[in-house]
Amino acid sequence: MRANPDLREIRDLLQRSGTVAVVGLSDRPSRTSHAIAGALQSFGFKIFPVNPNLRGPVLGEEPYESIQHIPTPVDIVDVFRRSGKVMPVAEDAVAAGAKVLWLQSGVINEEAAAYAEEHGLTVVMDRCIKVDYATLVGVS
């Protein structure tokens, strides 16, 4: 398995990022994606829900069908999809000009990670963005 950036680099990318597209965000508060997206908002990130099945706002934000539909630049693409469904997300992230492809804990796709890296994205795989932010940056 490819190596993630070291913890210092992960901390730095979290500190310099302000926008996160949350791919696979659910409108159900009981879902992990919902809880983590809410935490990202509390940390000060502007989130963009990306889920073509959503019909209304989630956590106060209008959903988008794809990353490319988001009208402002996205720093991090945080992925809550099954590992086998990540390649189209990586392609969308590259096409949208995102900087980081972040695959949540349990999400591993070496092919998608290699594709994203070949196109200049930093890739973090099989890690929780909420835990890493709280641990590496801290919560005030």
Regions found by a protein language model. Give the residues of each.
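NAD(P)-binding Rossmann-fold cofactor-contacting core
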Residues: 26-31, 38-58
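Short gly/ser/thr-rich secondary-structure transition/capping motifs
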Residues: 1-5, 57-64
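Rossmann-fold NAD(P)-binding glycine/threonine-rich loop
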Residues: 105-133, 138
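Conserved beta-strand elements of the Class I
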Residues: 20-23
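Short N-terminal or domain-adjacent regulatory/targeting segments
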Residues: 1-16
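Mid-chain, well-packed structural core segment of small domains
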Residues: 67-107
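A short helix->loop->beta-strand "cap" motif at the edges of active sites that frequently abuts
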Residues: 43-45, 96-100, 119-121
